[in-house]
Amino acid sequence: MNKSNIIMIGMPSSGKTTVGKLLSHKTGKSFLDTDHIIQSKTGLSPKDYVSAHGLDSFLETQQNVILDLAVENSIIATGGGVIYNAEAMEHLKGIGIVIYLKTDFEILESRVSKDRKLARKDGKSFYDTYLERIPLYEKYSDITVECGEKLSSHIAEEILSIIQQG
């Protein structure tokens, strides 16, 4: 399998799904969201799955969904916690270009609704989770895009430009 996929990683509310859909529209590639795949397989949203079965079970389900991905020419938006699973990340790196949507904490905090349940380890705060994940996103990404206050359409154009430059 070639690396024809574009895989989006980043914190919750960093724009993975929004930018991914824009990239899908611009490139004609299919769009997949691993959280939506999990929901269709389990009948539960990631939030409800974590509440019912716990974070470890969710991360295992997420890993299985990702390891089962055998797609080409697709844009794949992943759950924010995917970087906790080395095997899943190595699989993603093997099937595509991994793009990290790096977004400042203050921007993320303003986007995340207060009642949104995030896949946090050991009851950590959103900020602690953010700090913990940054080195993992950087470790696994092929390309990092500094999102700042950029419009999603500009981020998508920047990603396409970087990929086309090769």
Please describe what each predicted stretch is.
Residues 36-82, 86-93:
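ATP-dependent small-molecule kinase phosphotransfer cores
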Residues 17:
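Walker A/P-loop
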Residues 95-135:
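A glycine- and Lys/Arg-enriched "phosphate-lid" helix/loop adjacent to the NTP-binding pocket
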Residues 14:
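ATP-binding Walker
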Residues 1-3, 22, 26, 72, ...:
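NTP-dependent small-molecule kinase module
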Residues 11:
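P-loop (Walker A) phosphate-binding loop of NTP-binding proteins
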Residues 25-36:
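Post-Walker A helix-loop "phosphate-sensing" segment adjacent to the P-loop in P-loop NTPases
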Residues 8:
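Hydrophobic anchor at the beta1->P-loop junction of P-loop NTPases
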